[in-house]
Swiss-Prot record:
Disulfide topology: none
Chief place where the protein resides: nucleus
Organism: Rattus norvegicus
Name of this chain's protein: Elongin-A
Lineage: Eukaryota, Metazoa, Chordata, Craniata, Vertebrata
Gene coding for it: Eloa
Coiled coil location: none
One Pfam family named in its UniProt record: Elongin_A
Length: 773
């Protein structure tokens, strides 16, 4: 299940890498890929190596992509040359100086990562296992299968010992403490002898850039590493002939025991094969079960064991949070607590070798531990729990599911409730977290690399620290401050102001007009500025820019009601001047007729009217502008009256040309269509013949028979033409009545069709019109 879920996650991340060009997202996806347990099968099936390799020239993520591809390239040689490395490992181990031990641990951890990804996380289906065995050499197959099932046993044991994704804070922190088990028997031996050192100092081995990300992934998958951390003794309990033998040996006796360990492993290859087949069938049966049933069972087991182990775990977590990495004695106590957890699980007391092995830790490791301790001592002890809680909240949610089901990413994401803090405090706490993580993930020359790494991490934290400030951005629209004017006293004779739509056009001293059209419209009272706009474009924003004085309000009302002004009484001209400026000449003349006092002072207003209506005229001697305007206006009206009379007389004496007449006064009325058809059918149209047609003499009485025929035929042929000129006949309808008056109607003789004059005229006009084009 783990390998299948890893395959699904790799495919999802590969699709996101291809789709998303954002450098931050690309870096995030590459980091997720770097911490996944990638195997050669996954690389071959998904082709994710090519996808990541395409980013090697990217500006932001190019270096990370190159490191990741280089890390994946090491998978294949490590798997093929595993036996040779197993043989040469002990020799190189014995030759190295004591200060090179951390680098040796780094190589061991890298070998474990690669071999565990290749074997422990293989798919459970037989097809995948057969593909894997084809790629591996024949000598490696039993070793890989045996080691894969040791890993599975440890994983099952870790699920039973610790509740799935235990919510205790130590479970997430132990992910840092734990380094994964080795992939080969002698590596397992060396790692078991070094396990107290790992318990004493978190992450003594300092991984490469890719391994740093694997440690962060271990934080998220705290259950597996807690199980591995607590399951060191469990491995020894499951295989007592190996672990007890290895733990009782001192560290310096590794070379002597290599042959015995390899011999024992070969003797157990057959049994491990059978065990692998049995476990494979159990795993396939588990896969067939619904995932929800498996999750529920694991949750029940975890909850029951959590109740049993809560005292020991609480003690361990308290020790870990109060002074993590401060004193060796407290670390020995926490290791004893872990051993008590293992003893509850297995029923055996195997906690003795760990303290014994702790006494044999090399001095250089203790010195390095002192360096790490000085880094952690700089932080205040009170802020450490807060920082770690913040780390847990940021890195992952409180885990509630098992290891495999959490890897499948199929559970609904719960929204985290974060306390909104100021950006300064958030950056401060994240800075503390940064120092904590850096102090636990550097090797011997960490003192030189810390400043550079802190700079890189601060660059990443800047956008994260700026995020809490984003929701606080509120659009600051500056609202106009209303003037602090006291309200006037309420009067009994109160009349409300007119609608607010009209206010904007009546603001006094408005000089800046956008166009002459608006300037002209502003001169008329009671009109909106956009009165010609017929299309609705939103409600007009009409409001008072400032409170108008009582005088301004009165003048505005008077301007809007000039036609209602008659006698003004004793109101002086200076008060009425703004109103009189808006008056037309007729309105001004009417107001002056009602108030003769104003005539003496309105001469300037009449001057404006004279310049507008009579631009070229000048007043005569001793003539006021008012008198001039009235004189010129009277002269204009007289000229207009004279012109009107001349035009009327000219039209009256004009000879009448074409006159409109009624259509059928002196001619035959056109009968309706159905009546005309019946007349033609039955020959009953004689009554409609007018008197004019009868004026022609009938040629029947005199002359030979030849003459009447000719006369009748000529009259027959001439009558239609005459009729055409006499009236607006539009068809040959009344040809039958004409013929019936002279000659009896012959139904066998077809009537001659003639196009009506109006229709002929229309057709001619159409022809002329279209022929011109």
């Amino acid at each position: 299940m783990a390998a299948e879920s890893a395959l699904q996650v790799v495919e999802k991340l590969q699709a996101r890498l291809a789709a998303n060009p954002d450098p931050k997202k690309l870096l995030k996806y590459l980091k997720k890929l770097s911490v996944l347990p990638i195997t050669v099968d996954i690389l071959v099936e998904t082709g994710v190596g090519k996808t990541v390799n395409s980013f090697r020239k990217h500006e932001q993520v190019g270096n990370f992509a190159r490191d990741l591809v280089a890390q994946w390239k090491k998978l294949v040689p490590v798997e093929r040359n595993n036996e040779a490395e197993d043989q040469d490992f002990e020799k190189s181990n014995s030759r190295k100086r004591p200060r090179d031990v951390p680098q040796q641990e780094e190589e061991a951890e890298g070998n474990y990562q690669e071999s565990w990804q290749a074997s422990g996380s293989q798919p459970y289906s037989p097809e995948h296992r057969q593909k894997k065995h084809r790629k591996l050499p024949e000598l490696e197959r039993p070793h890989k299968v045996a080691h894969g099932h040791e890993r599975r046993d440890e994983r099952k044991r870790c699920h039973k010992v610790s509740p799935p994704y235990s919510s205790d804070p130590e479970s997430s922190d132990y992910g840092h403490v734990q380094s994964p088990p080795p992939s080969s028997p002698h590596q397992m031996y060396t790692d078991l002898s070094r396990s107290p050192e790992m318990d004493q100092e978190p992450i003594v081995s300092h991984p490469k850039p890719g391994k740093v990300h694997s440690n962060t992934f271990q934080d998220r998958l705290g259950v597996s590493h807690l199980g591995e951390h607590q399951g060191k003794g469990a491995v020894s309990q499951n295989k007592p002939h190996k672990s007890s033998h290895k733990e009782k040996r001192p560290v310096d006796a590794r070379g002597d025991e290599k042959s015995s360990v390899m011999g024992r492993e070969k003797s157990h290859k057959a049994s491990s094969k059978e065990e692998s087949r049995r476990l494979l069938s159990e795993d396939s049966a588990k896969e067939k079960l619904p995932s929800s049933v498996v999750k529920k069972e694991k949750d029940r087991e975890g909850n029951s064991l959590k109740k049993k182990l809560s005292p020991a775990l609480d003690v361990a977590s308290d020790n870990h949070f109060k002074k993590p990495k401060h004193k060796d004695s407290e670390k020995i106590k926490s290791d004893k607590n872990k051993q008590s957890v293992d003893s509850v699980d297995s029923g055996r007391g195997t906690g003795d070798p760990l303290p014994r092995a702790k006494d044999k830790v090399p001095n250089n490791l203790k010195a390095q531990e002192g360096k790490v301790r000085t880094n952690s001592d700089r932080k205040s002890p009170g802020s450490l729990p807060k920082v770690e809680e913040m780390d847990m909240d940021d890195e992952f949610e409180q885990p509630t599911m098992s290891f495999e089901s959490y890897l499948s990413y199929d559970q609904p994401r719960k929204k985290k409730k974060k306390v909104v803090k100021t950006s300064g405090t958030a950056l401060g706490e994240k800075g503390l977290k940064k120092k904590d993580s850096k102090s636990t993930s550097k090797n011997l020359n960490s003192a030189q690399k810390l400043p550079k790494a802190n700079e890189n991490k601060s660059d990443k934290l800047q956008p994260a620290g700026a995020e809490p400030t984003r929701p606080r951005k509120v659009p600051t629209d500056v609202l106009p401050a209303l003037p602090d004017i006291p309200l006037p006293a309420i009067q009994t004779n109160y009349r409300p102001l007119p609608s607010l739509e009209l206010i904007s056009s009546f603001q006094p001293k408005r000089k800046a007009f956008s166009s002459p059209q608006e300037e002209e419209e502003a001169g008329f009272t009671g009109r909106r500025m956009n009165s010609k706009m017929q299309v609705y474009s939103g409600s007009k924003c009409a409001y008072l820019p400032k409170m108008m004085t009582l005088h301004q309000q009165c003048i505005r009302v008077l301007k809007n009601n000039i036609d209602s002004i008659f006698e003004v009484g004793g109101v002086p001209y200076s008060v009425l001047e703004p109103v009189l400026e808006r008056c037309t000449p007729d309105q001004l003349y009417r107001i002056e007729e009602c108030n003769h006092v104003l005539i003496e002072e309105t001469d300037q207003l009449w001057k404006v009217h004279c310049h507008r209506d009579f631009k070229e005229e000048r007043p005569e001697e001793y003539e006021s502008w008012r008198e001039m305007y009235l004189r010129l206006q009277d002269a204009r009206e007289q000229r207009l009256r004279l012109l009107t009379n001349n035009i009327r007389s000219a039209h009256a004496n004009k000879p009448k040309g074409r006159q409109a007449k009624m259509a059928f006064v002196n001619s035959v009325a056109k009968p309706p269509r159905d009546v005309r058809r019946r007349q033609e059918k039955f020959g009953t149209g004689g009554a409609a013949v007018p008197e004019k047609v009868r004026i022609k003499p009938a040629p029947y009485t005199t002359g030979s028979s030849h003459v009447p025929a000719s006369n009748s035929s000529s009259s027959f042929h001439s009558s239609p033409e005459e009729l055409a000129y006499e009236g607006p006949s539009t068809s040959s309808a009344h040809l039958a009545p004409v013929a019936s008056s002279s000659v009896s109607y012959d139904p066998r003789k077809p009537a001659v069709k003639k196009i009506a004059p109006m229709m002929a005229k229309t057709i001619k006009a159409f022809k002329n019109r279209f022929s011109r084009r």
